[in-house]
């Protein structure tokens, strides 16, 4: 007898129904797993994007055209740049990325407990103020107040012995001027290209600024290295509470630059050794270990590895890198890399060492860098010279990682 399949018992599912149910179950499981993974990635990338947005910058119009520039201040006055030197190449504001707000914010908080008496000095008779761990150079400037015109005058003159921030062994310095606690408005000098002893001689006027409000402000100067393609690199800073300065006449200061309070904390240190063999025309770089590295991951740790670049006349020649140490802020590497460097090319050679945080799901993060050459910072130059003075001997030294 013919029996219609659709008339079969309702309690007995067919094979096709079971197959479709299995496919739907597997699809739902895969979808849930992918959604969870995407949510985790979004949280991690969102945190970095949020940090990148916490910046401040005031675009300046008309830079380099010779006209006066004014900014309306909360106190009711205005700031005017009256730089007398025309024809100098300005830095293009559209090419500059904004810097983090934390540098100025941290300084405002710290100044409440650091209102120290400051005395004016001259280039000839003022000694360096204390012994800093690293020489960041010094800056000369003057400040005074005109009571008849209610105008505060700040003149940025020059700087000396600035550290090299570029891998070419030089810097492109400029100065930002703030009257704290106002952090939104700033004035800037021109950029001095490839100059570690720049002369600016630029004058800035804060007009219509009552004296009783001036003495409540803190003059803050920040020296930075201009970078057209990335964030400007802070070199150092100086701050003066104006209630501690005799403003009845122009006072000239020579002040040592102090490390900028970037709010990011220490990036850690790296121990490495250099061994120069003049007969073999080679340098062996041994990456030994690091300590107190900055945590870059959400879990409060990092997956560090080290890249070593050999540069010659600002051009990349060769790259080496270590293995990655998982979840370790005090990794031990003990990896050596040999680079062929003829003696006659040694002065134009730079070794760039970058400690990175490995990330599987996004771009690897830079923890910190070290530039080794004849023209780097004081600590780096010392290591380089010690290497030359002691051929065929490994010379080890700790280096502070920098941004």
Swiss-Prot record:
<feature type="binding site">
    <location>
        <position position="359"/>
    </location>
    <ligand>
        <name>Ca(2+) 4</name>
    </ligand>
</feature>
<feature type="binding site">
    <location>
        <position position="357"/>
    </location>
    <ligand>
        <name>Ca(2+) 4</name>
    </ligand>
</feature>
<keyword id="KW-0564">Palmitate</keyword>
<dbReference type="GO" id="GO:0005829">
    <property type="term" value="C:cytosol"/>
</dbReference>
<feature type="compositionally biased region" description="Basic and acidic residues">
    <location>
        <begin position="90"/>
        <end position="100"/>
    </location>
</feature>
<keyword id="KW-0472">Membrane</keyword>
<dbReference type="GO" id="GO:0042734">
    <property type="term" value="C:presynaptic membrane"/>
</dbReference>
<dbReference type="GO" id="GO:0036465">
    <property type="term" value="P:synaptic vesicle recycling"/>
</dbReference>
<dbReference type="GO" id="GO:0000149">
    <property type="term" value="F:SNARE binding"/>
</dbReference>
<feature type="binding site">
    <location>
        <position position="225"/>
    </location>
    <ligand>
        <name>Ca(2+) 1</name>
    </ligand>
</feature>
<feature type="modified residue" description="Phosphoserine">
    <location>
        <position position="122"/>
    </location>
</feature>
<dbReference type="GO" id="GO:1990927">
    <property type="term" value="P:calcium ion regulated lysosome exocytosis"/>
</dbReference>
<dbReference type="GO" id="GO:0090385">
    <property type="term" value="P:phagosome-lysosome fusion"/>
</dbReference>
<keyword id="KW-1133">Transmembrane helix</keyword>
<dbReference type="GO" id="GO:0005764">
    <property type="term" value="C:lysosome"/>
</dbReference>
<keyword id="KW-0488">Methylation</keyword>
<feature type="binding site">
    <location>
        <position position="227"/>
    </location>
    <ligand>
        <name>Ca(2+) 2</name>
    </ligand>
</feature>
<dbReference type="GO" id="GO:0005516">
    <property type="term" value="F:calmodulin binding"/>
</dbReference>
<dbReference type="GO" id="GO:0008021">
    <property type="term" value="C:synaptic vesicle"/>
</dbReference>
<dbReference type="InterPro" id="IPR001565">
    <property type="entry name" value="Synaptotagmin"/>
</dbReference>
<dbReference type="GO" id="GO:0006909">
    <property type="term" value="P:phagocytosis"/>
</dbReference>
<feature type="binding site">
    <location>
        <position position="230"/>
    </location>
    <ligand>
        <name>Ca(2+) 3</name>
    </ligand>
</feature>
<feature type="binding site">
    <location>
        <position position="227"/>
    </location>
    <ligand>
        <name>Ca(2+) 1</name>
    </ligand>
</feature>
<protein>
    <recommendedName>
        <fullName>Synaptotagmin-7</fullName>
    </recommendedName>
</protein>
<dbReference type="GO" id="GO:0001786">
    <property type="term" value="F:phosphatidylserine binding"/>
</dbReference>
<keyword id="KW-0458">Lysosome</keyword>
<keyword id="KW-0449">Lipoprotein</keyword>
<feature type="modified residue" description="Phosphoserine">
    <location>
        <position position="52"/>
    </location>
</feature>
<feature type="binding site">
    <location>
        <position position="365"/>
    </location>
    <ligand>
        <name>Ca(2+) 6</name>
    </ligand>
</feature>
<feature type="binding site">
    <location>
        <position position="227"/>
    </location>
    <ligand>
        <name>Ca(2+) 3</name>
    </ligand>
</feature>
<comment type="subunit">
    <text>Homodimer. Can also form heterodimers with SYT6, SYT9 and SYT10. Interacts with calmodulin (CALM1, CALM2 or CALM3). Interacts with CD63; required for localization to lysosomes. Interacts with APP.</text>
</comment>
<feature type="binding site">
    <location>
        <position position="359"/>
    </location>
    <ligand>
        <name>Ca(2+) 5</name>
    </ligand>
</feature>
<keyword id="KW-0597">Phosphoprotein</keyword>
<feature type="binding site">
    <location>
        <position position="233"/>
    </location>
    <ligand>
        <name>Ca(2+) 2</name>
    </ligand>
</feature>
<feature type="transmembrane region" description="Helical">
    <location>
        <begin position="17"/>
        <end position="37"/>
    </location>
</feature>
<dbReference type="GO" id="GO:0099502">
    <property type="term" value="P:calcium-dependent activation of synaptic vesicle fusion"/>
</dbReference>
<keyword id="KW-0812">Transmembrane</keyword>
<dbReference type="InterPro" id="IPR037732">
    <property type="entry name" value="C2A_Synaptotagmin-7"/>
</dbReference>
<dbReference type="GO" id="GO:0050796">
    <property type="term" value="P:regulation of insulin secretion"/>
</dbReference>
<feature type="binding site">
    <location>
        <position position="297"/>
    </location>
    <ligand>
        <name>Ca(2+) 5</name>
    </ligand>
</feature>
<feature type="modified residue" description="Phosphoserine">
    <location>
        <position position="61"/>
    </location>
</feature>
<keyword id="KW-0770">Synapse</keyword>
């Amino acid at each position: 007898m013919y029996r219609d399949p659709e008339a079969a018992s309702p309690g007995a599912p067919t094979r096709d129904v079971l197959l479709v149910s299995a496919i739907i179950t597997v699809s739902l499981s895969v979808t849930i797993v992918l959604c969870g993974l995407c949510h985790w990635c979004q949280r991690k990338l969102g945190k970095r994007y949020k940090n990148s947005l916490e910046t401040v910058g005031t675009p300046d119009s008309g830079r380099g055209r010779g006209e006066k520039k004014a900014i309306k201040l909360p106190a009711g006055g205005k700031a005017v740049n009256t730089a007398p030197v025309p024809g100098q190449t300005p830095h293009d504001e559209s090419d500059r990325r904004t810097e983090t707000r934390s540098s100025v914010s941290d300084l405002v908080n710290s100044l409440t407990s650091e209102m120290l008496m400051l005395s004016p000095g001259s280039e000839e008779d003022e000694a360096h103020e204390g012994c800093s761990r690293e020489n960041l150079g010094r800056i000369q400037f003057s400040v005074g107040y005109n009571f008849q015109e209610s105008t505060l005058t700040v003149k940025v003159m020059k700087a000396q012995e600035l550290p090299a921030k570029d891998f070419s062994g030089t810097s492109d310095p400029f100065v930002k001027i703030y009257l704290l606690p106002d952090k939104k408005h700033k004035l800037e000098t021109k950029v001095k290209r490839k100059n570690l002893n720049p002369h600016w001689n630029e004058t800035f006027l804060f007009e219509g600024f009552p004296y009783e409000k001036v003495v409540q402000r803190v003059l803050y100067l920040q020296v930075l290295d201009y970078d057209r393609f990335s964030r400007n690199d802070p070199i150092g800073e100086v701050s003066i509470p104006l209630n501690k300065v005799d403003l009845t006449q122009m006072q000239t200061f020579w002040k040592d630059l102090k490390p900028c309070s970037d709010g990011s904390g220490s990036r850690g240190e790296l121990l490495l050794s250099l061994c120069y063999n003049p007969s073999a025309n080679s340098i062996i770089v041994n990456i030994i270990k690091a300590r107190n590295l900055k945590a870059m991951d959400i879990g409060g740790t990092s997956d560090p590895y080290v890249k070593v670049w050999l540069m010659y006349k600002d051009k990349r020649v060769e790259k080496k890198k270590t293995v990655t140490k998982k979840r370790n802020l005090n990794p031990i590497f003990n990896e050596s890399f040999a680079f062929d460097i003829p003696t006659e090319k040694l002065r134009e050679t730079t070794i760039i060492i970058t400690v990175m945080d490995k990330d599987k799901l996004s771009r690897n993060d830079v923890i910190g860098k070290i530039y080794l050459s004849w023209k780097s910072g004081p600590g780096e130059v010392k290591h380089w010279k010690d290497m030359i003075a002691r051929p065929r001997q490994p010379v080890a030294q700790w280096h502070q990682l920098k941004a």
